[in-house]
């Protein structure tokens, strides 16, 4: 009787596994279809607004211009001709975050006649420490629109067009041609490749900036005869688990302000023909020591897939598929573990409430652990997991294969990396991560638990 029950259980289990696999396959197909429809919808929504109307061509400065821009007009290498070039120029800024805000602010203030602002996101409180065009009163509205409001307060003569939708392979080729210089102020790899390929195909200078923690980088791609493009330097995108954005790694607001202001300066230099443009070189900023380094980077790659004389890429592709990550700076949820190696926060909460013996490892850095932590969590930074220094510390718990170990992090990504590594050493142990991490805990278990 017991054997029959066991056989029935296995048969039912196999049926459920097959059903789950079928549903997952159907879900994946629907997800792909949804993505295609969303891209098409974005394209249709953008068609009526992407084209920059014919610009007014100015031949002289007004009295207001002379008064407003007098401090740069008297620069010997800039003068009236430089100001006229700025007044007749159009610059596209992709991303109105920590980099895009200062860049837009300085370009509008300097008298750039036309600005395009691209950002799909809305203002939220966590933006305000570094995204200086936005305010508390504008939380919840489009970042592009919020930036437009602030910029027109600075300079009402600047013509500003907002694109409050995600830049993609469809609308990029409609938006970008109308602009003279493109600023990459995004915070994700997929958009970097998208902008690079579009600018290379359309022969538009691309001023690229990045900032993370206390470090920043700046260069100009697709400029001049021998200037490299982004693909010349990075032909292959990094694996998703190796990518850290400011939402995960943090950033000091003054660092993004520094790099964003320098992006504006490089754009002005390109437009005016001022000084030596930062092409073929990269500026590296170390905020912790306040040091700048200027290093030479490789020239145009003869066999580059997009900017060589015989390119393999002549149109835009699916960059989320190419990079294996989303074209935004939101949570990029990794999928490194099998479902049975994960536990949802509700099930873990029940287990913890029932006081069942277990070990909860929090793999966030100590600075994040200090902000908040789950009850009974032990802080073991991911680096200590990866170098196996945790083994001796928890030798007693690891002796028993039955003693359950759970791993948690902020969003459920680092915890997967930790579990994956621990399972290589202890394959028979019960080691699982808390799915979606502390963000899920706040959402599903305790809404008063801090989220950051």
UniProtKB/Swiss-Prot annotation:
GO terms for biological process: Mo-molybdopterin cofactor biosynthetic process; protein urmylation; tRNA wobble position uridine thiolation. Keywords: ATP-binding, Cytoplasm, Metal-binding, Molybdenum cofactor biosynthesis, Multifunctional enzyme, Nucleotide-binding, Nucleotidyltransferase, Phosphoprotein, Transferase, tRNA processing, Zinc. Its main location: cytoplasm. The modification Phosphothreonine is found at residue 59. It is an enzyme of class 2 (transferase). It is found in: Cytoplasm, Cytosol. Pathway: tRNA modification; 5-methoxycarbonylmethyl-2-thiouridine-tRNA biosynthesis; Cofactor biosynthesis; molybdopterin biosynthesis. Its EC number is 2.7.7.80, 2.8.1.11. In the N-terminal section; belongs to the HesA/MoeB/ThiF family. UBA4 subfamily. PANTHER family: ADENYLYLTRANSFERASE AND SULFURTRANSFERASE MOCS3, UBIQUITIN-ACTIVATING ENZYME E1. This is Adenylyltransferase and sulfurtransferase MOCS3.
């Amino acid at each position: 009787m017991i054997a029959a029950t066991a056989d029935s259980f296995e048969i039912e289990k196999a049926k459920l596994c097959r059903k789950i696999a079928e549903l997952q396959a159907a879900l994946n197909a629907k997800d792909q279809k949804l993505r295609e429809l969303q891209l098409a919808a974005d394209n249709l929504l953008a068609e009526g607004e992407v084209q920059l109307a014919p610009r007014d061509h100015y031949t002289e400065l007004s009295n207001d211009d002379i008064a407003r821009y007098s401090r740069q007009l008297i620069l010997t290498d800039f003068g009236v001709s430089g100001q006229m070039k700025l007044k007749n120029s159009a610059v596209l800024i992709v991303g109105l975050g920590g980099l895009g805000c200062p860049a837009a602010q300085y370009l509008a203030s300097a008298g750039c006649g036309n600005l395009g602002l691209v950002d799909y996101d809305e203002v939220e409180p966590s933006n305000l420490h570094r995204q200086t065009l936005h305010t508390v009163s504008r939380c919840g509205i489009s970042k592009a629109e919020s930036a437009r409001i602030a910029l027109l307060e600075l300079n009402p003569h600047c013509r500003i067009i907002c694109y409050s939708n995600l830049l993609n392979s469809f609308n990029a080729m409609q938006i970008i041609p109308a602009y003279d210089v493109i600023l990459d102020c995004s915070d994700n790899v997929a958009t970097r490749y998208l902008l690079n390929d579009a600018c290379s195909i359309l022969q538009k200078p691309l001023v690229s900036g990045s900032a993370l923690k206390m470090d920043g980088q700046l260069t100009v791609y697709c400029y001049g005869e021998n200037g490299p493009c982004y693909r010349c330097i990075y032909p292959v995108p990094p694996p998703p688990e190796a990518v850290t954005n400011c939402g995960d790694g943090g950033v000091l607001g003054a660092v993004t302000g520094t790099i964003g202001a320098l992006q504006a300066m490089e754009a002005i230099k390109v437009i005016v023909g001022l000084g030596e443009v930062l092409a073929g070189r990269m500026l590296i900023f170390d905020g912790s020591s306040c040091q700048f380094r200027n290093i030479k980077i490789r020239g145009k790659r003869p066999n580059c897939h997009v900017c060589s004389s015989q390119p393999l890429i002549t149109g835009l592709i699916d960059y989320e598929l190419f990079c294996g990550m989303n074209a935004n700076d939101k949570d990029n949820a990794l999928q490194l573990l099998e479902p049975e190696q994960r536990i949802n926060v509700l099930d873990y909460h029940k287990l913890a409430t029932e006081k069942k013996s277990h070990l909860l490892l929090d793999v966030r850095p100590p600075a994040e652990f200090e902000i908040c932590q789950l009850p009974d969590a032990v802080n073991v930074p991911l680096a200590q997991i990866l170098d196996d220094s945790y083994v001796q510390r928890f030798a007693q718990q690891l002796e028993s294969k039955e003693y359950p170990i759970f791993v948690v992090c902020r969003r459920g990504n680092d915890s997967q990396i930790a579990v994956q590594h621990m399972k290589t050493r202890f394959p028979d142990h019960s080691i699982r991560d808390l799915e979606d991490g502390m963000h899920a805990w706040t959402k599903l278990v305790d809404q008063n638990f801090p989220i950051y």
